[in-house]
Every structure is written in structure tokens, then in C-alpha cells.
């Protein structure tokens, strides 16, 4: 090597790990109306100060990397960087903190939940300085909300399409979820809808298996709901699961559902992905289909208390991506869910404006401007004796979905549906008359059972 090109190790650029808090911890920062705000539950590694941990989250989820790079000088770091602007301890937890991070709106592609999540949670959860990290909440500014279509139709349009007002809607997941032939599956759909339910549903893992291909299921379910409609005079629906291995196949199934004239299709939005879900939501709006969303895989992401993403964030993401219904727990059934926390994200799904309320887990005031609302679906281990509590907790703008609570009736599927419809009508009437569902719920069901042998069974 010539003297002119020889390089010694002691000469030239020296890379080194920098302290993130020098650049990304800015406690004096005043948040802007256009910032996306995030609340992270941070558990730093021993010896890592909370300010450094919070700054690391802000850096790694925005413009930062582990060292200074030459190209930092080619952009306006101050304009584009995320900022950790506040840190507070978690009550009762010595080593956990809530780190509040503000992100400039220009960091995100318009109308893309995929890009938003890739930026905010895509890489930082594996960061060495953190023992655990959980995204507790996001504040989506109106300027970003307005770049999304959101739910294909929303609550009021759905009620108008179905001509159903003044009560929760009733549904049922067909069981067993796997193994039925398409014809027997359609028979169960007919019996439930004929008995008085508004909807029946494919389970989340019913796609197109050898025992029941999707096209056969769609045809027999459409036949069942048209027959039930003709006999009851009510508009009925079955959530036809369009989830598939490719977006092209998913779209093909949605097109076939539209050609059959059914009112609603379904998608597993977490396993299917946000890009696929948003594409399907756009198709549903353009073609008059309602879209039911199942949250399969959510507990992998949201169940741990100190690591992952809280469901309220996933619920907000769904409202942006698009869906007319989404499963939201039950409070009283077989699946985990606290009442105050559940009511918090139910309001975030339905309401136009939700104020900050830490007692319900809402870290930021959220203004959805004109984005349509989403109906929460209560599903999982519920039956007629839960009806008073469900009616009180979820109110009219909800779907109460009973699987085993319908199909497990000793007299069969149709009597199970009758029992659910009678129980719901009794609870709604009692509530409208001023009775206390929480205190008198069991008495209301017992009184109704005197006039309904199906409910008394």
C-alpha cells in the first residue's frame, strides 16, 4: 500500500455509541396539534436511566440510530425527530415508567396504518436498553385521521341497511368451527337466523379447507339467509370470512359475496394484515358491503401487561384501517377484560370525541372528526343470563354474539336463537321502562321465561 493510501487505525472517523437523551429527551417541548403522541410503558435494563430509555424509544422509532452518521447533516433533524417530552413513574411499579413521545406528522405516509406501525413499533421493541416495552396509547391528530377512509359505512348506515333500531344486534358463531360440510353449515345458519338472530358468523379460522371450500360455504349460507329473511320479514346477515392467503384471493371472495347479494363479509385483520384490511374496507365501501372484523392473534400482542401493544391501540388502528364491527371482549364471559378499560376502548371505537381519562386507560383526548364509528362485538363464553349485564355495559350500539350460548341449547339451534332474542327484548324493554338491569337482571330473565319455553329450558 502506498503512503498516500495507507490508513492507520488511530486516524479518521471514530464511531461510538452516543447517549440518546442528549438529542431526543426534550422535557421543555410543547406538543403540536399535528403531532402523533404515544404513551409507552418502559421497563429499562438495570442501570439505564428512564430518561435515556425514553429517549432511546423516541430515537429508534423515528430518525435515530446508535451513532452519529454523516448524513445527519443533510436533513433537518430538529424537524423530523421524535421527542420524549415527559416521563412519569408507574404507580406500584419500581422499575416501570410511562414515556410520552411526540412524532412529527411528516414522518408518516398518509392513509397507511402499515407505515404508522412500522415506524412506531416496528424495530424498537427489540432494543437492548429495554427489558420490556408496551405501547399503551396513541393520540392520532385530526390532520392524520382525515387521510383515512375508516369504516366502510359506520353505525348509522348499518342500522339503516338492516332496518334495525333501538337495541343491540344479535349474532352467533357457528360451531363446531371446523369440520362441518357446507350444506350442514348452511343448515345451522338458517336455524339460527330463523330463530330470531340478526347475524351468524364464520369463525376466524374458517377459510377454505378440504372439508368445506369457501365457494360452497358462501352459496349455502346465502341460501340460508334468504330463506330466513323470507320467513321472518327481517333482514339477515352471515359474516362470510373473506380472509385468504393472498390479497387477490381475498378480493375474489369479496366479489363473489357481493354477487350473491349478501350484506356483510368478514376479515381477520391482524393475521391478514393492515394493508389487506384497508384494501378490503375500500372495496366494501365502494360496493355496499358491511365489514366484520375478527381480532384473531390479538392476545399474542396485547395480553402481557408490560410488553406488547394494548388493545386500545389496535382498536384505534382498526377504526383507521376500516371495519364496521370488531370483537372487543365481553367483561362477563370467558375471555379476559376489565370493565373500565373495556368501556374505554369501546368508546374509542364508537364516539366522535373521547376525553382523556386515565381511570379507563385513555392517555390522550382523541378527536375522530368525521370518521365513522365501529360497532363493538361482545363474544366469548356468554349466554342468556349474561344478557342484562351485556345490555347495560355495551348499550344499543353493539353486537352481542353467542356461539355455544345459542347452539348449546338443549332443544337445538333455533330454540337457542329464540331464547337469546326473547332475553334481549326483555332486557331492552325493562331498561326502557326504567328498571335497573344490574340489580334486577336475573328477575327480568325469569319473568320473560314464563312466556318463552325456549328461554325457560
From Swiss-Prot:
Q: Which residues does Mg(2+) bind?
A: 201, 203-204
Spell out the GO cellular component terms annotated for this protein, sorted alphabetically and separated by semicolons: chloroplast
SUPFAM superfamilies according to UniProt: RuBisCo, C-terminal domain (SSF51649), RuBisCO, large subunit, small (N-terminal) domain (SSF54966)
Identify which residues the record assigns to the active site: 175, 294
Instruction: Indicate the annotated site residue(s) for Transition state stabilizer.
Output: 334
Where does this polypeptide localize? Plastid, Chloroplast
What would be an example GO MF term here? magnesium ion binding
**What's the superkingdom here?**
Eukaryota
Keyword Transcription regulation set for record: no
Sites bearing N6-carboxylysine, chain numbering: 201
List of residues binding substrate: 123, 173, 177, 295, 327, 379
Enumerate the propeptide ranges.
1-2
Q: What CDD domains does this protein map onto?
A: RuBisCO_large_I (cd08212)
| Enzyme Commission number(s) | 4.1.1.39
According to its UniProt record, which reaction does this protein catalyse?
2 (2R)-3-phosphoglycerate + 2 H(+) = D-ribulose 1,5-bisphosphate + CO2 + H2O; D-ribulose 1,5-bisphosphate + O2 = 2-phosphoglycolate + (2R)-3-phosphoglycerate + 2 H(+)
Query: So which cofactors does this thing need?
Result: Mg(2+)
Instruction: List the keywords (alphabetical).
Output: Acetylation, Calvin cycle, Carbon dioxide fixation, Chloroplast, Disulfide bond, Lyase, Magnesium, Metal-binding, Methylation, Monooxygenase, Oxidoreductase, Photorespiration, Photosynthesis, Plastid
Miscellaneous comment in the UniProt entry for this protein: The basic functional RuBisCO is composed of a large chain homodimer in a 'head-to-tail' conformation. In form I RuBisCO this homodimer is arranged in a barrel-like tetramer with the small subunits forming a tetrameric 'cap' on each end of the 'barrel'.
State the function annotated in the UniProt record. Answer: RuBisCO catalyzes two reactions: the carboxylation of D-ribulose 1,5-bisphosphate, the primary event in carbon dioxide fixation, as well as the oxidative fragmentation of the pentose substrate in the photorespiration process. Both reactions occur simultaneously and in competition at the same active site.
Quaternary organization:
Heterohexadecamer of 8 large chains and 8 small chains; disulfide-linked. The disulfide link is formed within the large subunit homodimers.
Q: This chain belongs to which protein, by name?
A: Ribulose bisphosphate carboxylase large chain
Amino acid at each position: 500500500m502506498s503512503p498516500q493510501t495507507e490508513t492507520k487505525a488511530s486516524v479518521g472517523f471514530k464511531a461510538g455509541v452516543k447517549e440518546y437523551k442528549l438529542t431526543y429527551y426534550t422535557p421543555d417541548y410543547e406538543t403540536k396539534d399535528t403531532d402523533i403522541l404515544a404513551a409507552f410503558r418502559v421497563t429499562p435494563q438495570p442501570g439505564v436511566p428512564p430518561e435515556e430509555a425514553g429517549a432511546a424509544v423516541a430515537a429508534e422509532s423515528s430518525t435515530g440510530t446508535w451513532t452519529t452518521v454523516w448524513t445527519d447533516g443533510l436533513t433537518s433533524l430538529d424537524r423530523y425527530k421524535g421527542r420524549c417530552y415527559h416521563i412519569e413513574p408507574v404507580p406500584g411499579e419500581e422499575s416501570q415508567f410511562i414515556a410520552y413521545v411526540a412524532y412529527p406528522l411528516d414522518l408518516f405516509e398518509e392513509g397507511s396504518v402499515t407505515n404508522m406501525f412500522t415506524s412506531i413499533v416496528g424495530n424498537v421493541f427489540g432494543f437492548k436498553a429495554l427489558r420490556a416495552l408496551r405501547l399503551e396509547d396513541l393520540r392520532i391528530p385530526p390532520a392524520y385521521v382525515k387521510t383515512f377512509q375508516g369504516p366502510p359505512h359506520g353505525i348509522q348506515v348499518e342500522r339503516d341497511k338492516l332496518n334495525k333500531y333501538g337495541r343491540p344486534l344479535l349474532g352467533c358463531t357457528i360451531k363446531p368451527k371446523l369440520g362441518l360440510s357446507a350444506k350442514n353449515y348452511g343448515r345451522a345458519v338458517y336455524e339460527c337466523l330463523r330463530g330470531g338472530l340478526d347475524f351468524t358468523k364464520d369463525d376466524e379460522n374458517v377459510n377454505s379447507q378440504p372439508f368445506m371450500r369457501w365457494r360452497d360455504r358462501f352459496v349455502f349460507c346465502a341460501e340460508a339467509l334468504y330463506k330466513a329473511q323470507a320467513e321472518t320479514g327481517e333482514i339477515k346477515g352471515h359474516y362470510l370470512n373473506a380472509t385468504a392467503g393472498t390479497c387477490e384471493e381475498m378480493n375474489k371472495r369479496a366479489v363473489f359475496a357481493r354477487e350473491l347479494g349478501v350484506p356483510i363479509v368478514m376479515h381477520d385483520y391482524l393475521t391478514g394484515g393492515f394493508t389487506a384490511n384497508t384494501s378490503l374496507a375500500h372495496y366494501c365501501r365502494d360496493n355496499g358491503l358491511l365489514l366484520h372484523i375478527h381480532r384473531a392473534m390479538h392476545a399474542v400482542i396485547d395480553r402481557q401487561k408490560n410488553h406488547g401493544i394494548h388493545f386500545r391501540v389496535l382498536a384505534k388502528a382498526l377504526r383507521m384501517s376500516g371495519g364496521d364491527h370488531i370483537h372487543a371482549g365481553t367483561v362477563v364471559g370467558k375471555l379476559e377484560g376489565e370493565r373500565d378499560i373495556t368501556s374505554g376502548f369501546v368508546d374509542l371505537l364508537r364516539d366522535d370525541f373521547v376525553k382523556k381519562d386515565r381511570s379507563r386507560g385513555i392517555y390522550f383526548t382523541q378527536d375522530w372528526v368525521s370518521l365513522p364509528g365501529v360497532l363493538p362485538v361482545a363474544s366469548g363464553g356468554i349466554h342468556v343470563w349474561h344478557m342484562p349485564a351485556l345490555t347495560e355495559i355495551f348499550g344499543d350500539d353493539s353486537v352481542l354474539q353467542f356461539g355455544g350460548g345459542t347452539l348449546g341449547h338443549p332443544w337445538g339451534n333455533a330454540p337457542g336463537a329464540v331464547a337469546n332474542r326473547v332475553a334481549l327484548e326483555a332486557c331492552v324493554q325493562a331498561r326502557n321502562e326504567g328498571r335497573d338491569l344490574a340489580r334486577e337482571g336475573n328477575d327480568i330473565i325469569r319473568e320473560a321465561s314464563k312466556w318463552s319455553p325456549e328461554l325457560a329450558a
